[in-house]
Amino acid sequence: ANFRLKFGLIVTLIFFIIGFVVYYVPHVNPFTFNTYPNKLGASAEHWLGTTSMGQDVVWLLIEAIHNSLVIGLIVAVLGTVVGVFVGLLSGFAGGLLDRGLMIVTDTFVVIPSLPILIMMTSLMKGSSTTIVMALVLAMFAWAWPSRQIRSMALSIKERDFIHTAKFSGESTVQIVVTEILPYALTWSLSNFMNATLSAIGSESSLAVLGLSPGNLVSLGNMIQWARSYNAIFNKQYLWIGAPIVATVILFVGLFLLITGYNDYLSMKRGR
């Protein structure tokens, strides 16, 4: 039994239930100011109290989890799909196209992403949305999986069953879809989870620096707002503690899910 895989899956599922099921329970818009009295402590009505702007911390946290997961999923989908496509195309095409694609890919792998992300988010600050933020982060999410998929394609295309498929009259597209893609998708699931984790971490880092969209309720922005309003000095520990604890637990859950899944794949290969 893979404990890490099971535990990570349970933790991740809990966050997805909070972010995509509980989120749609009818409630007051948590971003609206002065909905409730300011700086309330924990109570039966407000489990984690209220902020200095009169917002319910629980619903603010649920909104933040939802938006952070949306950003992570968009980045993971775009990065994985583009990475798999470019990697397979490069690995099977070869020649000049392969060299050209790898030059672009290597450029995106080696250039430092954080300074560019800081510059772009600074330029778009105030006008950015959840989707735009995700698209910016996705710019750097495809390059590494592209290299991995290309290496996989180069290795697999020389195996006997690929040559057999060619001799049997299958086209290149058929071979890629039926023979190569299943291998790529197995690895891509691990990359998908890793990209989700990385995107949430990147957005949180930018938010704490004050560079995430100010109208976006995310885990990072929750921490930034609590810090800006001196939550610690005002002894509003639940306000600043809730997003920090949620971020840590989400990261641990995703990390255990990724490592557990990789161990599972290693066990399958060893059989």
Q: Where does each model-flagged region fall?
A:
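N-terminal signal-anchor/first transmembrane alpha helix
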Residues: A1-F31, L101-V104, Q174, A184, ...
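Hydrophobic alpha-helical transmembrane segments of membrane transport/permease proteins
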Residues: I10-S52, A207-L216
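Generic hydrophobic transmembrane alpha-helix motif, especially the helices
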Residues: W47, V57, G91-F92, L97-I156, ...
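Alpha-helical membrane-protein architecture signal
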Residues: T50, V58, I62, L97-V104, ...
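Transmembrane alpha-helix signature in integral membrane proteins
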Residues: V57-F92
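Membrane-cytosol interface at the C-terminal ends of specific transmembrane alpha-helices
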Residues: A76, V84, L88, G126-T178, ...
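Glycine-rich helix-loop "coupling/hinge" segments at transmembrane-helix boundaries
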Residues: S122-L123, A153, S202-A242, A246
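C-terminal transmembrane helix and the adjacent membrane-cytosol boundary/short C-terminal tail
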Residues: G126, F140, M193-N194, F233-R271
